[in-house]
From Swiss-Prot:
The gene is eno. (2R)-2-phosphoglycerate binds at residues 161, 335, 364-365, 386. One of its GO terms (biological process) is glycolytic process. Component of the RNA degradosome, a multiprotein complex involved in RNA processing and mRNA degradation. Pfam families: Enolase_C, Enolase_N. Its cofactor is Mg(2+). It comes from Ruthia magnifica subsp. Calyptogena magnifica. InterPro entries: Enolase, Enolase-like_C_sf, Enolase-like_N, Enolase_C, Enolase_CS, Enolase_N. It catalyses: (2R)-2-phosphoglycerate = phosphoenolpyruvate + H2O. It is found in: Cytoplasm; Secreted; Cell surface. This is Enolase. One of its GO terms (cellular component) is extracellular region. It is an enzyme of class 4 (lyase).
Length: 425
């Protein structure tokens, strides 16, 4: 079955900024559609979105990217067979001709890549995860729920970008979601009792002003306890430090605590948390260019927790290969829009698996109602997903999609729990 038409349009994401939506239409009029997200704290090496500049939408319009899809990309891909996603993605990479997809825009290329996958699944009358993986059993992901937001995701004084709860002790995804929602509501009550702000950040988590970064962990533990769960048994904690956002000239500047730490001191700062709290995952613990710091961190706590590279690797095989060779981190965050095609996403995930690294499927802070990443988490069996807190429909859409997938699979659905985190001693 061949591609007959490709249509793109400008739509809005969860922050009210434009993004690209694409419909891929086949000869039999089957349609596949996808929308792409956008990040706030972005790695320096990410594939580049194409934005219009000027005054329209404060410079963030995507009409140029839309035009490239409707002309160059459409003209190139018409009559391509829908079954060979690798060939289609490579044709777009070649057409773009830049390393960072900056000519056509990673937002244009990715929207087409995802829409092609959806069109192929719809043609087969299969859900996307099943179209991408014809397996017997499917692994549902353990959710990493960002319930306190700081850093670039919130207007508060918390330096660390995300404090997450991880309901790895739940027996199923459905129950994990319930654990998370109950803790979220109890956290709101805890914050209200302390006269703290309960407005939410970009990813649906609360964004209170706190006297220290560590206080975020303490209020979460209080909420877990109040909800009737045991921290370290039912629910664990994950951190996304996004440390590149507060790293400058070799120093980690924790403004909320009036501290400036060198790499070794910041490693000790994080290691102290791991020692004292049920933390099982730390993402972007060190700056994306502080390879020495990453080496120190991996040696110190890499056998106790999952150390996830996000800004460090930007879902790119070239950078992951360097990390594997240097023996730093033990996990990679997967954001499809950092690399710009589904084919390259699968390639980097295979490289991670082959090296014994885990992969964590992830949303971006600027999201849409598109639920593709939920299917990708199940199709790849990566076992973990980051898709925000327990509020905002752009986040809940992914969780609700996973609920439907688990129900659809019945006995074929496996919830891995702590087994998804294979670096814990």
């Amino acid at each position: 079955m061949n591609i007959k038409q490709i249509k793109a349009r400008e739509v809005l994401d969860s922050r009210g900024n434009p993004t690209v939506e694409v419909d891929v239409i086949l000869d039999d009029d089957t349609i596949g559609s996808a929308m792409v997200p956008s990040g706030a704290s972005t790695g320096q090496r990410e594939a580049l979105e194409l934005r219009d500049g000027g005054t329209r939408y404060l410079g963030k319009g995507v009409l140029k990217a839309v035009e490239f899809v409707n002309t160059e990309i459409c003209n190139t891909l018409i009559n391509f067979g829908i079954e060979d996603l690798g060939k289609i993605d490579q044709a777009m990479i070649d057409l773009d001709g830049t390393e960072t997809k900056s000519r056509l825009g990673a937002n244009a290329i990715l929207a087409v890549s995802l829409a092609v996958a959806h069109a192929n699944a719809n043609r087969q009358h299969k859900p996307l995860y099943m179209s991408l993986n014809q397996g017997e059993n499917y692994k549902l992901p353990v959710p990493m729920m960002n319930i306190i937001n700081g850093g670039e995701h919130a207007n508060n004084n918390v330096d660390i970008q995300e404090f997450m709860i991880i309901p790895a002790g739940a027996p199923s995804f459905k129950e994990a979601l319930r654990y998370g929602a109950e803790v979220f509501h109890h956290l709101k009550a805890v914050l209200e009792a302390k006269n703290m702000n309960t407005t939410v950040g970009d990813e649906g988590g609360f964004a209170p002003d706190l006297s220290s970064n560590e206080d975020a962990i303490k209020v979460i533990l209080e909420a877990i306890d109040n909800a009737g769960y045991k921290a370290g048994k039912d629910i664990f904690i994950g951190i996304d430090a996004a440390s590149s956002e507060f790293y400058e000239n070799g120093t980690y500047n924790l403004v909320s605590e009036n501290k400036s730490l060198n790499s070794e001191e910041f490693v000790d700062y994080l290691a102290n948390w791991v020692e004292n709290y049920p933390i099982i995952s730390i993402e972007d613990g060190m700056d994306e260019n502080d390879w020495n710091g990453w080496n120190l961190l991996t040696k110190k706590i890499g056998d106790k927790v999952q150390l996830v590279g996000d800004d460090l690797y930007v879902t790119n095989s070239k950078f992951l290969k360097q990390g594997i060779e240097k023996n730093i981190t033990n996990s990679i965050l997967i954001k499809v829009n950092q690399i710009g095609t589904l084919t390259e996403t699968f390639q980097v995930m295979k490289m991670a698996t082959d090296a014994g690294y885990t992969s964590v499927m992830s949303h971006r802070s600027g999201e849409t109602e598109d639920t593709t990443i939920a299917d990708l988490a199940v199709a790849t069996g990566c076992g973990q997903i980051k898709t925000g807190s327990l509020s905002r429909s752009d986040r809940l859409a992914k969780y609700n999609r996973l609920l439907r997938i688990e129900e659809e699979l019945g006995a074929k659905a496996v919830y891995p729990g702590l087994d998804a985190f294979n670096h814990l001693n």
